[in-house]
Every structure is written in structure tokens, then in C-alpha cells.
Amino acid sequence: MLTIKANLRIYHKKGATRRLRKQNKCPAVIYNRGQEPSIPIILNQNDILHPEAVIQLYKNNVILLFIENQQPITVKVQELQYHPFKSKLIHIDFTRV
């Protein structure tokens, strides 16, 4: 099982996410089941683009996210959005398992 460290994302607007991407970070969202609100998070590009991590992301395996000051969350990848010509992720959507 792949484990990734994440931080909560406070700012959700376009300018804030662009600044994150320039800092080699990747914005992501964890969608919950039912009426619970989604959780916006920030991931480090180096953790995600590691060869073992890429394989796990594409296999749609269960991933364990460690978010600061919270219990670990088990998720699956719902969608990966890549930059058109750079080898960087733009955004990831996770679904809570």
C-alpha cells in the first residue's frame, strides 16, 4: 500500500493553486461518501512522481494519506490531470474508501 503525506489546503482559488504548482506542489481533493464535505489537500510532486507511486496511482490501488494532525485516510484515485506537455500532475481527485 502506498503512503503519501499531505497538508490541508486553505486557499482554493485559481491564483493560489498556480502558486502551489510553481512551488512543486500538487493540489488535490478527497471526495467523501454521502453528505460529508470534500477535503482539499496539497501533495508534494516529488512524492507523487516517484516511480513506485506512479505505478500505484495508475493501478488504482488503495492509498493511505497522512494529513497533518488527523487520522490516516484510505483513498482511491478517481482522476489524474496531467499538464499537456510537461511531466507534472496538475490535479488529483481521490475518493474515500
UniProtKB/Swiss-Prot annotation:
The keyword Ribosomal protein applies. The keyword Iron-sulfur does not apply. Pfam families: Ribosomal_L25p. GO terms for biological process: translation. Gene3D superfamilies: Ribosomal Protein L25, Chain P (2.40.240.10). One of its GO terms (cellular component) is ribonucleoprotein complex. Keywords: Ribonucleoprotein, Ribosomal protein, RNA-binding, rRNA-binding. Part of the 50S ribosomal subunit; part of the 5S rRNA/L5/L18/L25 subcomplex. Contacts the 5S rRNA. Binds to the 5S rRNA independently of L5 and L18. This is one of the proteins that binds to the 5S RNA in the ribosome where it forms part of the central protuberance. This is Large ribosomal subunit protein bL25. The gene is rplY.
